[in-house]
Amino acid sequence: MKVLEAGHAVVTDLGRYEGPALGFSVNGALDQESAKLANILVGNAATEPLIEITASRVKVRLDRRAVIAVTGAPVEMHVEGQPCPALTPLGLPAGAEIAITLTGPGMRSYLAVHGSVEATALLGSVAPDSMIGFGTRLVAGLELPQLVEAPDLANPHLSVSLIHLGLRGPVVPAEPVIDVTDGPDREEFGTTAEKLFGAPFTIEPRSNHVGLRLTGAPPHREKPGEVLSRGVPVGAVEVPSDDQLLVLHRGRGVTAGYPVLAVLTTGALDVMAQVRPGQRVRFRRVSVAHARDEHRRRELALAHVRERVRIALVEHGLELPSHHGTDPVTAGAGSGSVTAPVDGHRSTNDVSVDPDADAPWG
């Protein structure tokens, strides 16, 4: 695959989970659910490398036949000048030129290729880390090797072959609601802690993959004294002394020294990945149990889509490897049991979930 127009895009995956124990940020796709879905739609494991496009336009040319899919923020996608839909597997010939332009709302979209693309890895992950200057950023002329050539999915009635799954794109509200659980320092804010859930907060331009700055009327810490630097989770809502909030995202350092008022849920982190500077958000307090059940529901919905995609792709001649036991989406999802960490907690309790109910894209 050759990059013709680069925009603001990188090769990434779900993150460097071996990194935090060694002092590295986890990084990875900021909208994890959209990244997982993109890989699922092309028959990959959810953990495979893919391209994250941030608020820009990217154009690439395929070197080999491929099955691709685009998810995340709404886009205009053209293949050889012909409009094509997102949220569905597309079978394309070698030499096809793909142009993807983010139209909004939303901030990030994901391009996955069946069999993935090759990029340099560190500690088992290709995720960029700006603090150490690691990662593959797209530039015009860059060649990204396609690891697999897909079979010919030619459709005699269409110039572009697609497998229609009827998935809907995520709805990005003008003022998203961000779910949070209580942070370890909530009691230090006394009665002012409730101010977090009152008026909205505005995303500042000085926001990136490390964290987002928000202005508004934040709570004020009532306990005097400094906070010693300690480990902080992805999603921590910190309250510094300058009347702003900091929401730490996947590029955050593993330690920090501000009080942590709240922690975003897994789903809320994906929502925050799609908000733009100047946009307003509102915080909503939820229990850890609610956050855990919501995470299971979303993972089961992804597993349901994976099974539909698997059947469709196999019928079209693709040979798909088994991902069970290694893929965070399929591992345990069939039984309704999810063992991946959820908002700092780990659980194997079953939960009754309708995988088609209120999935953000299905």
Where are these predicted regions, by residue range?
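Conserved "landmark" site that anchors the functional core of diverse proteins
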Residues: 1-362
